């Protein structure tokens, strides 16, 4: 049961939508959904564009056109539904978060409606455009490290030494948004042997975030360098027990990782696997089943896992606490540094969305998150 919209809120609003694979984006007028029990209606001011948006707009990944896009928002609470389970949100609060389940939760629109546990209050001293670049990939890092690797990330963080502090964990594509947050999360939870693989220009920053050592994936012998660094496996474990592939590219990451992984190595791969990148002239090619990628190239006993962040809600603790409590606390405490930003300009919401898509398609961004304004205050 939903409530009626407050009289100050418009019954319809504009949203950016896909129209066909690789076709120009368009603006569509959509209904404003009143918040039901435990829900929050948010006036969206900022959003980000992610590789998933490109995969959907150019490759039609898991959607039917026309489709609303966007999974990260920063905005202001416009209306609260009844029966709020926590007394932590007020109309007018500045908030941010990660949503993905239905059109009413898509973020490339001026109003969106979601559940209370998908909402983070903006901490003092953090700009909204910074926060909008955090939740999607910070949640991805938490989900991957716990669900795919089986690592423990208890909250609150316990005092004392992490018994796996010396275990080597390779973060391949560490300069990406997911990579940045994975490195920081691992550091904060006491994993001290994080091996970051990224272009050399990012190494100094990655060490500031928590990487113990960095290697450049453009080096022809990068696999040999990583294996030399980690040395022999301990207690029957593989030399590299965990590899997080933050990119999921057949040519760009997986061929090298297949050389690195051995029996017992858990390899978590961001989905979809990019078999062929989108270009101005060619459509992308994707694969959602990691076990169909590079058949015959993986050593026997390697555990391949396709990361599906949307499943994080199956973890009841994370569902109730990750966005509503943990993410804003880590930002407020300065534990997590937001990604470096690139503000995408344009005269209209549609133009900004299209400009962001073009930047993603041309692979023109490295080590930055694309954010853009949705609506004015």
PLM ranges: what are they?
Residues 2-36, 43-79, 86-377:
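Terminal helix/beta-alpha structural elements that buttress the NAD(P)+-binding lobe
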């Amino acid at each position: 049961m939903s409530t009626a919209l407050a009289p100050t809120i418009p019954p319809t609003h504009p949203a950016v939508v896909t129209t066909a694979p690789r076709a120009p984006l368009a603006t569509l007028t959509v209904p404003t959904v009143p918040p039901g029990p435990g829900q929050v209606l948010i006036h969206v001011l900022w959003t980000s564009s992610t590789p998933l948006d490109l995969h959907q707009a150019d490759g039609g990944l898991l959607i039917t056109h026309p489709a609303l896009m966007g999974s990260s928002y920063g905005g202001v609470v416009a209306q609260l539904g009844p029966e709020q389970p926590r007394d932590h949100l007020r109309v007018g609060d500045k908030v941010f978060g990660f949503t993905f389940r239905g059109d009413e939760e898509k973020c490339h629109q001026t109003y969106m409606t979601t559940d209370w546990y998908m909402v983070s209050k903006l901490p003092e001293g953090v700009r909204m455009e910074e926060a909008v670049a955090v939740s999607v990939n910070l949640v991805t890092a938490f989900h991957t490290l716990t669900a795919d690797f089986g690592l423990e990330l208890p909250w609150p963080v316990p005092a004392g030494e992490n018994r796996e502090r010396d275990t080597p964990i390779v973060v391949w594509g560490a300069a990406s948004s997911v990579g940045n947050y994975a490195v920081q999360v691992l550091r904060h939870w006491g994993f001290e042997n994080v091996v970051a693989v990224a272009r050399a220009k990012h190494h100094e920053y990655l060490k500031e975030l928590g990487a113990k050592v960095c290697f450049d994936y453009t080096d022809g012998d990068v696999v040999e360098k990583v294996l030399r660094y980690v040395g022999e496996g301990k207690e029957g474990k593989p030399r590299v027990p965990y590899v997080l592939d933050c990119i999921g590219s057949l040519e760009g990451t997986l061929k090298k990782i297949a050389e690195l992984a051995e029996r017992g190595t858990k390899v978590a791969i961001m989905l979809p696997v990019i078999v062929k990148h989108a270009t101005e002239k060619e459509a992308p090619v994707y694969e959602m089943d990691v076990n169909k990628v590079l058949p015959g190239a993986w050593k026997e006993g390697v555990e391949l896992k396709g990361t599906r962040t949307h499943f994080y809600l199956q973890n009841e603790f994370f569902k109730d606490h990750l966005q509503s409590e943990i993410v804003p606390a880590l930002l407020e405490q300065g534990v997590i540094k937001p990604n470096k930003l690139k503000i995408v300009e344009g005269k209209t919401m549609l133009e900004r969305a299209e400009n962001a898509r073009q930047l993603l398609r041309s692979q023109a961004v490295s080590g930055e998150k694309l954010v853009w304004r949705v609506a004015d205050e």
